[in-house]
A protein has these predicted regions:
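Terminal amphipathic alpha-helical/low-complexity segments used for targeting or macromolecular assembly
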Residues: 1-69, 124-128
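Flexible, glycine/small-residue-enriched loop-and-beta-strand segment within the central core
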Residues: 76-86, 91-169
């Protein structure tokens, strides 16, 4: 089977997303996961900062994986959450955004300052590639997107306001 046929006809939109292929971010399965993450993040951001047990419960449900001693200061924002993996002894300061359409892997002893943005998603620069073929109902996919993972190594400090683009490895 031709790779292009396999990607277009066999892979789910989530599989395409994680493989860095063009995918439809308006896919119903992806939207369901996205809405679930938004609800969990809202709950986390509204939980009293002293209620560490509830914050831990939410993070365990939201994130793809995490080590010991993770501290995330609210507010913070994600797309899916389940594509984010933290090592041990990590701290994320307030107002950070993780667009985890692909994997974001953060190593041990990482510090992330306020207002950091980590992006794994990007759009094709050719407008014709951003909008796919019409769906069976005649509508167009919302927008075709691609992704690349972001890897942050052990003992890395990301300074305030940094923007980390798709496909970047630090440390």
């Amino acid at each position: 089977m031709d790779l292009a046929v396999y990607v277009e006809e066999i892979m789910t939109e989530r599989e395409k997303m994680l493989a860095g292929q063009l995918y439809d971010c308006g896919d119903t399965e992806l939207l369901s996961q996205w809405h679930k993450a938004k609800d969990l993040v809202r709950d986390y951001n509204q939980t009293d900062s002293a209620d560490t047990e509830e914050k831990e419960r939410i993070l365990n449900e939201l994130l793809g994986g995490r080590g010991k001693n993770l501290w995330i200061t609210a507010p913070f924002y994600v797309d899916y959450g389940n594509n984010i993996y933290f090592g041990n002894h990590c701290e994320v300061n307030m107002n950070c955004t993780f667009l985890d359409d692909n994997v974001i892997r953060i190593g041990n002893n990482a510090l992330i300052a306020p207002n950091v943005q980590i992006y794994t998603a990007f759009h094709p620069t050719n407008a014709a590639d951003r909008f796919g073929k019409p769906k069976e109902d005649g509508s167009f996919p919302f927008c075709k997107t691609q992704t690349a993972p972001v890897i942050i190594g052990d003992n890395v400090w990301i300074g305030g306001g940094a923007i980390i683009m798709p496909g970047v490895t630090i440390g």
